[in-house]
């Protein structure tokens, strides 16, 4: 009988939904398992095979854990606010609400068609009022605790999307959404003070089970550095000091100039004392046209203007040094000014060479007439540091000197900056703040949340860069919640990252209208046991969500400090040509096409069999067909089925070994080798020519997490009772996983001459005698003097002859 996957798969998907077999149960006495995958952004393109691979890993783990007796929470939802939907809506004229609803319906249908065991009663959508009410609530809590604030600053602005972007969303000088060049623009911006949590975010990494590369990326992203703040007197000012931060205070004697950011406020303050203010003004105009990426490129030509009228005084030797402005120094980084040690910094060296500035060696080891020396060495030309060869010792000694003399102090800086948290677009969570002429910024009262996104027809961004909400008088004009006076609402919306910063908490209690989640349920489900997703999200999204969670923990809203106990990641699925899939290359594989042609079980099995789960692998249609043949052969096992409620003698060891292998490999995310073990066992079964009921039950149980439809159908066809989805995982006997016989090699003078099978627990002398009786070995040593005999257990016999 042939296997009709189309009718079988639909049948079981309907049955799983009808019975609610995948519904998580709050407060169950079973051990709990919370498995989390990154909820998708429901784009118009629909799901791609990368989504299938991303979800299939924990899908397999979750199905196995259910059969092991766990109460499993494996939820799904939709991260649906953001620019892609809004840009599509503007392009097509279809309202973003309608676009979002259509896309979510399509994604849901696709996910169900693949047979994922999600709990569909807990679905969340970040654009629904009952969800973003709590996003706004958390924002107001941050505002209340001083973590949400507004400041005027230069921002990364995308002229195409007409939106302000965070540094993280504009890396490489390009908009993360449309890939246009970004520009710098002065604007009032909402920030979240994530830097206040920098140390907590770093320390928390020691307590979690993340892949080493994920921890490394997060540490690098936060970018903690230790050094010193140093005060330089500014000659020409009213006794002002220019504060800088350096990780190398031991090189202070080598400072020969300073550089300010073109936007530094000291320039405007003393404009009337600066002789070349016209040249500086022109240079500042040029800088304003450049992106942050363009300004900080290491390989670009060095530009700058010397400030005539202000100069610095080196605090350790009293020397007067020039101050320049240059575009590579940014106001948003450090203090907006740097000290320059050209002998030992490549960028400073190039700048000094171009502008004819002194270069003084303070660390021996290089030839500074040719290039900066950036290595370690003995301190020279450095007063009280001369002769010190240990960098750490020199840094400590200088830091102490700065402190003792009141000219500096030890300090810490972070590469990570406070999070720009507003967008001038329609499709996002409204920021619940009111501007009152008398009271200033006033939060919308908690009991008035959600502040609803108004339903409008014109949602296009303004040419002035203001939010579309600014045009809606009925939304903007309001009364101050504090004094009742006429007031204006904030018209910017939150970035797409807002809703995804706490979604894992809402899954725990998605229908609660009194709190974002019940505290007893939060205690029961605890932190996410296992989170899997893409490597592209291990910095921004994960750091943002860890920050939100730690804040909620600090104010007593969640009972545990870290949101995710474990984090893993899957590799990309590449196109058949080995390149990254993209529409422009025409190498995109639609999962719907695979399901329609081969079935969901084949797709599920293939994406996990195609290679190491954590690494990228190209799509191969021939391998897909191989998985189809595998599923068909599994179905055909029923044709060679015999009676029997115990493993046959011939297959007993193979079954126990496979149970162990598959069980361990699923937990280790070695899905490809787990499937390979099942394929090997299948071959063993066919070589034997028959399979009994005990063996078939075990085989389909092991395969079920990977291919649930065909295995459920076999289980039901054979009247084994119940459903595999809530069946029992199989155990193995460790003693029966050990081979009775093993294959070893026999060497003569180190060269392999024969292979033979011997008992696994044989004594050395007996193993050597058996080896010598092998015809090939006997012939090779005949007439020769045996000098030495060695048995390496389980591996080889080596005979040395002369």
Regions from the language model: what does each represent?
Residues 3-13, 49, 135-359, 364, ...:
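NTP-handling and nucleic-acid-processing catalytic cores
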Residues 1-36, 66-75, 99-106, 283-324, ...:
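Conserved oxyanion/phosphate-binding beta-strand-loop segments in alpha/beta enzyme cores
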Residues 79, 144-160, 251, 410-439, ...:
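Helix-rich, typically C-terminal accessory recognition domains appended to large enzymatic cores
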Residues 38-47, 119-124, 330-338, 380-384, ...:
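Glycine- and acidic
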Residues 25-94, 100, 123-138, 246-247, ...:
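N-terminal catalytic cores of NTP/NDP-binding nucleotidyl/phosphoryl-transfer enzymes
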Residues 2, 11, 15-19, 91-242, ...:
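Residue patterns forming the tRNA-binding/recognition surfaces of aminoacyl-tRNA synthetases
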Residues 63-71, 91-97, 113-117, 144-150, ...:
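Secondary-structure transition/capping motifs at alpha-helix termini
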